[in-house]
């Protein structure tokens, strides 16, 4: 009887242990599934390009971005993003002193870590810091032909004011800033727009 009782007690303990392990695994999987998000945004941007006489000059454009995030905690999030900053018209001066004009096309990919502060029900403010690989392609205007491109690693900073419209949906007003470079032209790129984010 004692042996049977011990085996029964051991079986109950094992059952409890297995149940706790299964519950913990389910909770971990649930937490992981709830930590991922995807989103998209669009808006206007401004790129600092040099202007030369006789050629078009336009420092404003439109941008679009796609991003995916993973929330380590309710406040800390990792994000990977890709963006197309459109194009800017400007120019430069060759090493021999010859001015030339053309069009700058800028895009890139980046990673960042952010901290989200919830300051009111549904409202939050997030700041993030990371790095981006920014590609700038310059197409020469007549009378020249051809193009040149350069890819550089640049800092990436962002600020986002968000509102939780539903448990899985967030709308935000985003400001992202990085830099771009080609030839001797280098300067900041600022993107301002709205974004929608879906968590799953």
What do the PLM-derived regions correspond to, one by one?
Residues 156-162, 172, 195:
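Outer membrane beta-barrel transmembrane domains
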């Amino acid at each position: 009887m004692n042996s049977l009782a011990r085996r029964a007690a051991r079986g109950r303990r094992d059952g409890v242990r297995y149940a706790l392990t299964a519950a913990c695994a389910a909770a971990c999987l649930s937490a992981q599934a709830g930590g991922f998000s995807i989103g998209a945004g669009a808006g206007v941007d401004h790129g600092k390009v040099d202007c030369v006489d006789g050629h078009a000059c336009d420092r404003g454009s439109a941008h679009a971005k796609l991003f995916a995030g993973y929330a380590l905690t309710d406040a800390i999030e990792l994000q990977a993003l890709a963006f197309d900053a459109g194009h800017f018209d400007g120019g430069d001066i060759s090493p021999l002193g010859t001015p030339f004009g053309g069009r700058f096309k800028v895009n890139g990919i980046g990673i960042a870590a952010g901290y989200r502060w919830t300051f009111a029900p549904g409202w939050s403010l997030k700041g993030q810091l990371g790095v981006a690989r920014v590609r700038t392609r310059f197409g020469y205007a007549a009378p020249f032909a051809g193009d040149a491109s350069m890819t550089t690693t640049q800092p990436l900073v962002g600020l986002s004011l968000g509102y939780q419209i539903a448990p899985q949906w967030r709308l935000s007003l985003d400001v992202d800033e990085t830099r771009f470079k080609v030839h001797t032209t280098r300067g900041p790129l600022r993107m301002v727009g709205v974004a929608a984010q879906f968590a799953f």
